[in-house]
Amino acid sequence: MLLIGVAGTELSAQERDWLQHDAVAGVVLFKRNFASRTQVAELSAAIRAAAPRPQLICVDQEGGRVQRFREGYSALAPLQSFGALYATDPEGALAQARAHAQLMASEVRASGVDLSFAPVVDLARGNRAIGDRAFSDDPQVVASFTRAYVQALHAAGMGATLKHFPGHGTVLEDTHVDHASDPRPLDVLLAEDLVPFVAGIDAGADAVMMAHVVYPQVAPEPAGYASRWIEQILRGQLGFRGVVFSDDIGMAASFSAGGVAGRVHAHLDAGCDVVLVCHPELVAESLQAVAGRTLNTAALIGLIGRGALGWDGLLADAPTTSLSASFGTLA
């Protein structure tokens, strides 16, 4: 199945046609798709109305520099701010992370959007793309935050997506623009980067997003193209039973599988349930690529339509209103 990107704040005729395709499971929204709270709710409704089957509508609303919906939404802190507090006040830091998750999820759901791809559970060890998106460089600290964040998302009615498996934080390269390779063996990864993923899976995480990083001592392909990582380690060894998302096939580190069709097939063949096609110019070719494939159409049902509050419902919710006052609102 595919999660696709659309170009603007309203659906075009071509995009409505795409949503009719059996392989399209939903839409990923970006800054380019956002103008206001009202508009994004209308866009979400239009996406659902255009498709003959339920659609999963997603966004990256992590906080800090990765927050696609801004004006009219709470200013969410980057996750690293909670990690910094943990050294002096661990319980307070975990409580703030739970509040962050609850507020983010409530506002996203109020907009008619099902899922924010969160939390980032990579280690904060110098990666250019991750940076302050990660809680900490300590695996056990990140594991504690991961458990708390997953539980808070569930309490707010949203699924949890752990990213970027099996850990993107230690390589320096940004896989949006470059290839990345992590030379460490599996036993080291299990003792370090994979610790938060294990904690999140144990806490009931609903989904995992793969990294476009190569770990050559484990598999020769980027993790999202490697059945060794997805089928043997994630599902087999770690016992994960949820949804596996690829990362975006428009990123430079994904190009090792060849053209658009090659990337789509490589992810699906490796065991990904859903391939992210975030660039609209890649959607038509991706749809051609999946023609004739058997698709796991039931995989996303548990993430779709958990019941949007609407903004009236959100504002009437006293705990969420007090959280918003604590974090502040973007004008």
Swiss-Prot record:
Its EC number(s): 3.2.1.52
Q: Where does this polypeptide localize?
A: Cytoplasm
| Residues annotated as binding substrate | D60, R68, R133, K163, H164
Any one GO molecular-function label of the UniProt entry: beta-N-acetylglucosaminidase activity
Organism's domain of life? Bacteria
Entry annotation: catalytic residues: H176 (proton donor/acceptor), D247 (nucleophile)
According to its UniProt entry, the protein's GO biological process terms are: carbohydrate metabolic process; cell division; cell wall organization; peptidoglycan biosynthetic process; peptidoglycan turnover; regulation of cell shape
Q: Please state what class of enzyme this protein is.
A: hydrolase
Kindly list any coiled-coil regions of this protein: none
Keywords recorded for this protein, A-Z: Cell cycle, Cell division, Cell shape, Cell wall biogenesis/degradation, Cytoplasm, Glycosidase, Hydrolase, Peptidoglycan synthesis
Pfam families per record: Glyco_hydro_3
Catalyzed reaction equations: Hydrolysis of terminal non-reducing N-acetyl-D-hexosamine residues in N-acetyl-beta-D-hexosaminides
A single Gene Ontology CC annotation of this entry is: cytosol
In which pathway does this enzyme or protein participate?
Answer: Cell wall biogenesis; peptidoglycan recycling
Keyword Hydrolase among UniProt keywords: yes
Q: Where is this site: Important for catalytic activity?
A: D174
Q: What is its main location?
A: cytoplasm
| TM annotation in the entry | none
Q: What does this protein do?
A: Plays a role in peptidoglycan recycling by cleaving the terminal beta-1,4-linked N-acetylglucosamine (GlcNAc) from peptide-linked peptidoglycan fragments, giving rise to free GlcNAc, anhydro-N-acetylmuramic acid and anhydro-N-acetylmuramic acid-linked peptides.
Q: Which family does the record assign? A: Belongs to the glycosyl hydrolase 3 family. NagZ subfamily.
Any idea what this protein is called?
Beta-hexosaminidase
The scientific name of the source species is Xanthomonas campestris pv. campestris (strain ATCC 33913 / DSM 3586 / NCPPB 528 / LMG 568 / P 25)
Q: What is the lineage of its organism?
A: Bacteria, Pseudomonadati, Pseudomonadota, Gammaproteobacteria, Lysobacterales
Q: Which gene does this sequence derive from?
A: nagZ
